[in-house]
């Protein structure tokens, strides 16, 4: 180990930065965030330093470097574009046994600055020892996505509860189980972020007073339209905290590879006209797993509240008193249109968007007259088998036969396929495509030739 990772208490302690440019400014922000009493020495300063000095946040010393500036310092940073000056600052600091960082010269420095993930009071520092800063930055970005944004507030609140938890739970095992339950409670984290004192108190009392082997909870998570990169950060955090993941066929393998390795996986794949697992049985699976005290994630393609039957599943949980929450996802209409170069709205062509299911309940009928109107975009989910009927009904109700249409298969995935034409060809085009597919109808489809970007990569 070439470097010992430590966390320094710099609040109200003298620190020095030599340099007045952009690099020095980035270092100054970190020291100011840490509460340091900061002096900055340079021949000239960018405007941000002047603004900080005017606000009383730091002291500026304009002129050549003077070693006496180090006499009261705990820590120094050399951040100029003059290697000779940086070396001089480093040697002067070392002579006084003061740790000194030299920007972009780790061998000349007595300490290095890591990449930082700040969830105060929780702090994570990542370093490659100066050998590969880009790698350290990429790793930091990965870790950023895994740590909920409000985790620091939860950690701070947990510190306030330590005494009460120690009284409430007599064994270390009970306390550990309680803390695990608290740190994954999304409702508490959100309440703390919103400073909702009533919700904070209610959630805390519920967590403390309910049995540790309580009935669990269900989180409904939208996986997005296919590309794993479109999964939200909150969705990623939820699937990596799950005990059980219940998923359907629209969830890609790339997304399932992000699920916690030791989580149970329950496949309930569905498609229009054929259900591997009946919807009622899916509802009961969620209920049974939650009643075992497990943290269940119901992972659904797209957005769970847009033709995903998420509302029906949550009604079952609500009726049984099972706690639940929802993480929205990018719906197929948004993802498929963007990856096909088709804007859903455009000032010249469409002032509204209709999201329509092509898989109606028996006896259901759409308002075809309104759907046939101009200046709008129609997006049909699960409409492949009904394409000929959609074509017929829209033309019967006045939509021009030359209206542009597109069908997007496996939208946003590397296997995405798009075919376009006119409304009079819709039924024929649908026969060339496979499920899952999305039908887009409207003048905006005509922009595809100009705006298509994904198929060119």
UniProtKB/Swiss-Prot annotation:
Pfam families: CysG_dimeriser, NAD_binding_7, Sirohm_synth_M, TP_methylase. InterPro entries: 4pyrrol_Mease (IPR000878), 4pyrrol_Methylase_sf (IPR035996), 4pyrrole_Mease_sub1 (IPR014777), 4pyrrole_Mease_sub2 (IPR014776), CobA/CysG_C (IPR006366), NAD(P)-bd_dom_sf (IPR036291), Siro_Cobalamin_biosynth (IPR050161), Sirohaem_synt_dimer_dom_sf (IPR037115). The modification Phosphoserine is found at residue 128. PROSITE patterns: SUMT_1, SUMT_2. S-adenosyl-L-methionine binds at residues 225, 301-303, 306, 331-332, 382, 411. Pathway: Cofactor biosynthesis; adenosylcobalamin biosynthesis; precorrin-2 from uroporphyrinogen III: step 1/1; Cofactor biosynthesis; adenosylcobalamin biosynthesis; sirohydrochlorin from precorrin-2: step 1/1; Porphyrin-containing compound metabolism; siroheme biosynthesis; precorrin-2 from uroporphyrinogen III: step 1/1; Porphyrin-containing compound metabolism; siroheme biosynthesis; siroheme from sirohydrochlorin: step 1/1. Its EC number is 2.1.1.107, 1.3.1.76, 4.99.1.4. Residues 1-204 are annotated as: Precorrin-2 dehydrogenase /sirohydrochlorin ferrochelatase. The active site is at 248 (proton acceptor), 270 (proton donor). Keywords: Cobalamin biosynthesis, Lyase, Methyltransferase, Multifunctional enzyme, NAD, Oxidoreductase, Phosphoprotein, Porphyrin biosynthesis, S-adenosyl-L-methionine, Transferase. Residues 216-457 are annotated as: Uroporphyrinogen-III C-methyltransferase. In the N-terminal section; belongs to the precorrin-2 dehydrogenase / sirohydrochlorin ferrochelatase family. In the C-terminal section; belongs to the precorrin methyltransferase family. This is Siroheme synthase. It comes from Shigella boydii serotype 18 (strain CDC 3083-94 / BS512).
